[in-house]
């Protein structure tokens, strides 16, 4: 494994701008391969669909150094530190591909289109595609700003100690992030054409459905959030519906991994604090922090209803069932330094 990292930076007054390129290919990464029972098994030189290594096992996983991956990105950063204001602004354009990966949101058994296990051990590269954690565009910013009010500051530098106790010592901070969505896969239910233990992904044969975060009509009435603009929930016979754009994998196929992309996300966290200077060695700081300031509801492409059962349950195909972030949370804190 090797990596290539090059960059250039320029500084003007109190601001620094950086441009960087990062290339990180990966070879011989550990990957779990399910040894393809029973569809690919042989017995006495003859192919048979139901031969097991042992009557006690229906499948057998093994770890092998056969994984490969590649990560390429361009990064642009702007930093400022002056006058009580410090901030970082960063943009990343990247692409990450591999034959199996995990994201933090994935459970112990990696199913529902986010599997890191190899379906066809004789052709592991069939699963090569965008990494589960791949985000094409990402922008983030963080800042800390000490308000220029109070003794020794730009405004009110000569105010009394009592006035400074009220007006001075205030600080605002924040963290903002926006990114494009994570990839996800679709696969049918009860479909093991290649591997007895692992279902193959579906294969896109029609027009790629438009994905994002949409409010669509539901089969039981009303509306609800869905990853597809036209999932086909209320009209599964619509030839343009997302549910009709896929086919089951054939024997020997692993299907398409992470062919589709979920909705993007953004989040804002902010904090407000007040510090009282008691003497040169002691101070008291009270803080108020808010997470998900806008209380925005953003759905998780890793938890979509029946993307693993589109053939049998089209009436709920593509419905979101989990969110990426928790609702707005606030916390208060106190810190005494001595």
Regions found by a protein language model. Give the residues of each.
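Short, solvent-exposed micro-motifs at the edges of structured domains
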Residues: 1-338
């Amino acid at each position: 494994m090797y990596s290539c990292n090059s960059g250039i930076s320029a500084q003007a007054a109190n601001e620094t701008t950086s441009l960087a390129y990062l290339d990180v290919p990966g070879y011989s990464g550990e990957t779990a391969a399910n040894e393809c029972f029973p569809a690919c098994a042989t017995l006495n030189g003859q192919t048979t669909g139901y031969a097991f290594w042992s009557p006690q096992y229906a499948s057998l996983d093994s770890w092998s150094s056969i994984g490969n991956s590649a990560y390429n990105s361009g990064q642009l950063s702007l930093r400022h530190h002056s006058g009580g204001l410090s901030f970082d602004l960063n943009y990343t354009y990247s692409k990450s591909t591999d034959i199996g990966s995990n994201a933090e949101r994935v459970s112990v058994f990696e199913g529902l289109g986010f599997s890191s296990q190899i379906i066809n051990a004789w052709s592991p590269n069939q699963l090569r595609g965008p990494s589960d954690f791949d985000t094409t565009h990402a922008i983030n910013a963080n800042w800390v700003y000490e308000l220029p009010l109070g003794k020794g500051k730009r405004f009110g530098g000569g105010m009394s100690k009592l006035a400074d106790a009220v007006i001075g010592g205030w600080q605002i901070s924040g963290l903002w992030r926006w990114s494009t969505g994570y990839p996800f896969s679709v696969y049918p239910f009860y479909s093991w054409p290649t591997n007895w233990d692992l279902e193959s992904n579906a294969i896109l044969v029609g027009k790629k459905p438009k994905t994002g975060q949409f409010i669509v009509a539901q089969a039981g009435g009303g509306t609800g959030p869905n990853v597809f603009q036209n999932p086909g929930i209320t009209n599964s016979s619509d030839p343009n519906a997302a549910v009709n754009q896929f086919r089951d994998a054939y024997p020997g196929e692993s299907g398409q991994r992470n062919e589709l992309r979920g909705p993007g996300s953004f989040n804002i966290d902010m904090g407000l604090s007040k510090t009282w200077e008691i003497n040169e060695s002691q101070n008291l700081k009270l803080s108020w922090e808010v997470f998900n300031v806008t209380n925005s509801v953003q759905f998780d492409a890793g938890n979509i209803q029946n993307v693993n059962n589109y053939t049998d349950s089209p009436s709920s195909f593509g419905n979101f069932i989990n969110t990426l972030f928790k609702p707005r949370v606030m916390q208060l804190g106190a810190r005494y330094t001595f």
